[in-house]
Amino acid sequence: APHSSQVVSFDPKTTATLHVNSPKLWWPNGYGPQNLYTLHLSFEIDGKSSDSKDVSFGIRKFSYSVSDSENLTISVNGVRVFIRGGNWGLDEAMKRNPRERLEAQIRMHQIANLNMIRNWVGQSTSEDFYELCDKYGLLVWDEFFQPNPADGPDPDDFDTYMANVREKILRFRNHASIVLWCARNEGYPPKKIDDALRVLMAELEPTRLYQANSADGRGVNSHGPYHWRTPREFYTFNEAFKTEIGSVSVPTLESIHGMMPEKDWETINDDWAEHDFAKGASGGDSYPAMIAARYGRVLNLADFVRKSQLANYEAFRAMYEGRNAKLFHPTTGIITWMSNPAQPSFVWQIYHHDLEPNSALFAVKKAAEMVHIQLNESTGDVEVINNLAVPLSARAHLAIYNLDGSAVYQRDYDVSAATSAATSLGVVDWPAGLSAVHFVKLELKNAEGKLVSENFYWRALPGHQDDLRALDGLATVTLDAKVARRDVPGKSYIDVMLHNSGTQVALMTHLQLRRKRDDERVLPVYYSDNYISLVPNESRTITIEAGPADLMGDALVLVDGWNVAVAASSSRGVELELNVDAQVEHWPVTGLPMTSSSK
C-alpha cells in the first residue's frame, strides 16, 4: 500500500540461490584468506528495477569456549585464534576520514599481524570501516554506546537507545568480521538495558557472543597499565583476555616537527601536553627521566626520538610477547590501548596521525607473528610460539654478541612445537665474560631450512637490567646499501638491500621514503620491516610499497638509526642517503627541559 513498508524474507529452503556449495571460508588475518561473497538484491515493478543493493558477506563459524578453559576463547572455523588487537576510539577526531585514509589505517593493522580491532564505545560508524575489516581480516569487537560509568551517564531515553542498537545490528550484522557485541566499556549496563539487549541478541544475533562488560567476565580484564613499563614487567600480567594495555609511543622526528611549531620542539611544554604528553594515565611527566636513566642523558629532541624508538620497540614487543609466553594458559587475547590515534599524539599508537609508523608497529609485527621465536625477558627461556593449526618441526639458533660486536656464544636447538602453544627450549646458559650490555639474536628455520622468524634483543646483566646506558657509546656503523625500483600498474616497489660489513652491531636501522622532487615524506607507505638491527656481516632486504602517483617521479630513501650511517646509493628512479636531520649532532644540545606547567 502507499506510504507503507513490508518485511520480505528469503528462506534457503525455498530460495535455491541462497545455497552455497563447498563455500570458501573467511578467516581472520594470519589464519587463512578473507574469502567474500556478494548477494545481489533488487526490487522490480512491472519487470523494471526500482531499487537494488549488493551485500558483501563471508562464510565462517565462530565459537567462544573450549573444554579446557573457562576464559573467553575465540575460535574461527574450528581453529582456536589468539586475539592480537588494537583499540580504536574515533577513527579521526573530526570524523574527516575518507575511505582511502581509513584503508591505510586498517591495512597497517594487517601488516602489524593484528587480527582484531576493538570499536571502543562504537565510535567508528562508517560502512567503510566494516567493509575494510572484512577485506583485511580484522575481527571486530563491536560496542554499543555506553562509556565507562565514571565517564558518562546511563542513557536517558531507553526506547531511543534500544532503537539505535537495533538499527546498528541490522545495518552491520552481515559483515563477516564482527565477532561479538559488547554493551558497555568498563562497566555493566543498567539491568533494564542488559535484559533488553539479551532479548534483542536472541532475536537478531543468536550466533554471535554478547559480552555485557568490556572489563569483566570469563577472564576479560581492562584497566591498563597505560604508561611505559620495562619489558620484563609485561610478563607479570596474568589476565586471560586483556582489552586495554598501552604505553607512550613517540612518533618520528618529522611527525613531531609537523604537529607543533618550531618554538616548542626543544622544550616539553603545554603544547606537548595538548598532544597527550603530560601527567596522568600515559605517564608523560615521568617518561623523560625514565628514558635518561635507562638509555643515557637526552641531549635534544632528535636524541629523545632516537631513544624513544628503542623504548617503543621494547615496550610494544614485550606487551605481546609477554602474552605469547602464556599462550592459551591462561592468555587468550590482548588488545593494545590504542593502535590508532584520533589526533596527533605522543602516546597510545602504532603509527602517527599523519600515517607514518613508528617503531611500535614493527615491534608488534614482530611479536604477533603466527610462528615466532622469542626470549622470555622474565625467565630467560627461549620460546617458540606456534599459532598454526598444525604442529611445527624446526631448527632454532641462538647467538650472543658483546657490546663490541664480538660473538661470544652460539647454540642450536631442535624444535618440536605443538599447535596453538608456546614451547620452551630451555633457559639460556649465559656464558662468562659478557659485557655489561650485550645482544641476543634468535633465528627459527622450518624443516626445509627457510627462515620463518628472527628476533634481536639488547640486554643488561642481572642486577642492572634497567641500565642500558652503555648503548649510547656504540661506535657508528656505516652500512653498505643498494636500492632497486620496480614499477607495476598502480604500485611502485623499492628494495633496499643493507649489509653490515663492520665489526659492530648496527642498532635500530630506520628507513623513510620521500619524494626526490620536494623532499617530502610519502604517506602512507608500507614497509616489509623497519627499525632493524644487523650484526656484523649480516645482510637484510626491506621492501617499500608506494603508489607511483604519490612519488610523483623519483624516490628518495633516507636512512638513520641508533648508531647508523650509510654510503649513498642510487639506481633508476631512486636514490638513498643518510637522514641528516635525524642525527643528534645536527641539532644544538638543549637537554630538552620540561616546563613546570607541563609536569
Predicted region positions:
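Secreted/periplasmic carbohydrate-active enzymes, especially glycoside hydrolases
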Residues: 1-116, 327, 331, 356, ...
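Alpha-helical structural signal in soluble globular domains
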Residues: 42-44, 128, 132-136, 171, ...
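Active-site-adjacent substrate/metal-binding segments within catalytic domains
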Residues: 48-149, 157-180, 278-306, 310, ...
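Active-site region of glycoside hydrolase catalytic domains
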Residues: 51, 166-270
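Flexible loop/turn segments at secondary-structure boundaries
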Residues: 65, 90-91, 124-126, 148-150, ...
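Structural recognition of the beta-strand scaffold that forms the well-ordered cores
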Residues: 82-85, 116-119, 139-142, 179-183, ...
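Short beta-alpha connecting loops at secondary-structure transitions
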Residues: 149-155, 182-183, 411-412, 426
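Substrate-binding clefts and catalytic carboxylate motifs of secreted carbohydrate-active enzymes
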Residues: 181, 233-399, 408-410
